[in-house]
Amino acid sequence: MHFFQSSLVAATMGAALVAAAPAADLETRGSCTFTSTSALKSGKASCSTITLQNIAVPAGETLDLTGLKTGTTVVFDGTTTFGYKEWEGPLISASGTSITIKQNPGAKIDCDGARWWDGKGGNGGKKKPKFFSAHKLNKSNITGLKVYNTPVHGFSIQSDHLTIKDVLLDNSAGTKLGHNTDAFDVGSSTYITIDGATVYNQDDCLAVNSGEHITFTNGYCNGGHGLSIGSVGGRSNNVVNDVTISNSQVINSQNGARIKTVYGATGSVTGVKFQDISLKGITKYGIVVQQDYENGKPTGKPTNGVKVSDITFEKVTGTVTSSATDIYILCGSGSCTNWTWSGNSVTGGKKSSSCKNVPAGASC
């Protein structure tokens, strides 16, 4: 028998009658509590509020929050865990319109990624499940989730008008063997806001590969690869427009503020603003724009098929390690134009002698 509770029915008829409720009553049912994925799958469509209570997701299964009724609220309660299997995931998938996803005080989502970590991430070794697919989660909110130790990528975002606020993604236990644990990957999306994220990971804190009207603000990023646009190029959608990344800290990471585009590809990066970004302990580049990525690696030879225009770097300040490079700009011929460069100060590392085609006003 599927287990779920309805506050509208159980309050007067008792839990024993819930499973036997006629179909007509299912449409009016309000608050439902689920303790298993099977009960969630069969009962979610009838609920306006869903509480997920200490769910242990079986190995190789997705916690399926897709196709929810418009206006549904989902509440994580207790500890959510996942069985072990080598597969691509996702561990959680959500879709719908005007959905709210949040958690009760003290709740957490524990992926126990150490079971998969082998230092190779998505590049070999064990096949690792991605964490959260937020595809077609439109006009919705994800608030206050506490997420620990994703096996590989965190939130995959492909939605419109989605706000993610005050989310913790803590992969600090993966410092040695965690890899490709990107926190927020954004693609083919519009009007995305990520506000107040706290991230400890081993890859990009934010990566915007395509999309428009995207805001990342009040973030704290520790241990990963920094705040990134790209890599842009070579995908079905190669347009990034109107992205603001502001009031954020990047600590003990490879890069601070980064734009990277693919060698030989076409596309555009326009209207991107990095504003009030604080850097500390950066180990590779404080500010970096590279147009030379091929097969995921830099070639040192930039191309100009992806236009990088109307870019603002304003008050990106802080320190890099002595072996790092303060600023590195490697643009294709004529492809980096109309930049605003103001109040930036990155110190502690080396000055690059390999910058090319630096746009007017910027310094390298």
Curated annotation (Swiss-Prot):
GO terms for cellular component: extracellular region. Its EC number is 3.2.1.15. GO terms for biological process: cell wall organization; pectin catabolic process. Glycans are attached at N138, N141, N338. It catalyses: (1,4-alpha-D-galacturonosyl)n+m + H2O = (1,4-alpha-D-galacturonosyl)n + (1,4-alpha-D-galacturonosyl)m. PbH1 repeats lie at residues 159-188, 189-210, 211-231, 240-261, 269-291, 303-324. The keyword Transmembrane does not apply. It is an enzyme of class 3 (hydrolase). Gene3D superfamilies: Single-stranded right-handed beta-helix, Pectin lyase-like. Residues 21-29 form a propeptide. Residues 1-20 form the signal peptide. One of its GO terms (molecular function) is polygalacturonase activity. Keywords: Cell wall biogenesis/degradation, Disulfide bond, Glycoprotein, Glycosidase, Hydrolase, Repeat, Secreted, Signal, Zymogen. Coiled coil: none annotated. It is found in: Secreted. Disulfide bonds join C32-C47, C205-C221, C331-C336, C355-C364. It comes from the Eukaryota. The active site is at D203, H225. Involved in maceration and soft-rotting of plant tissue. Hydrolyzes the 1,4-alpha glycosidic bonds of de-esterified pectate in the smooth region of the plant cell wall. Belongs to the glycosyl hydrolase 28 family. This is Probable endopolygalacturonase B. It comes from Aspergillus fumigatus (strain ATCC MYA-4609 / CBS 101355 / FGSC A1100 / Af293) (Neosartorya fumigata).
